Amino acid sequence: MLGKKLHVKKNDTVVVIAGKDKAKTGKVLQILPKKDGILVEGVNITKRHTKPRGSESGSIVEKEAVIHVSNVMIYCSKCDKAVRTRTNTLEDGKKVRVCVKCGEAFDK
């Protein structure tokens, strides 16, 4: 079963608008539509403690954890802030996401 369509895509630059990492920006690494979640580079870092296995020693690994998609907004480089998006249809029928404030296209 497919998940929902989310307002962000992989490699988008987003701003966190809620939670402990509020106001941080980062690139979307992975989309998880079934959980309504995303992984953002450098945001919501958690520590994973691993036990020693064979020749490997135990360690503490830091990695990104999933955050809910409603806690992020797309970053517009032209407006220099987090913005809402609108979908516009081009003359050739292709749909693109654009900034509501300035009209900058995010899908090229």
From Swiss-Prot:
The record, for Pfam families, names: KOW, ribosomal_L24
* GO cellular component entries: ribonucleoprotein complex; ribosome
Q: Report whether rRNA-binding shows up as a keyword of the record.
A: yes
InterPro entries listed in its UniProt record: KOW, Rib_uL2_dom2, Ribosomal_uL24, Ribosomal_uL24_KOW, Translation_prot_SH3-like_sf
Q: Name one GO molecular function term.
A: structural constituent of ribosome
Q: The organism sits in which domain of life? A: Bacteria
Keywords assigned by UniProt, alphabetized: Ribonucleoprotein, Ribosomal protein, RNA-binding, rRNA-binding
Q: Kindly list the biological process annotations in GO that this record carries.
A: translation
The family line of this record is: Belongs to the universal ribosomal protein uL24 family.
Q: What does this protein do?
A: One of two assembly initiator proteins, it binds directly to the 5'-end of the 23S rRNA, where it nucleates assembly of the 50S subunit.
The annotated subunit structure for this chain is: Part of the 50S ribosomal subunit.
Q: What is this protein called?
A: Large ribosomal subunit protein uL24
Organism annotation = Geotalea daltonii (strain DSM 22248 / JCM 15807 / FRC-32) (Geobacter daltonii)
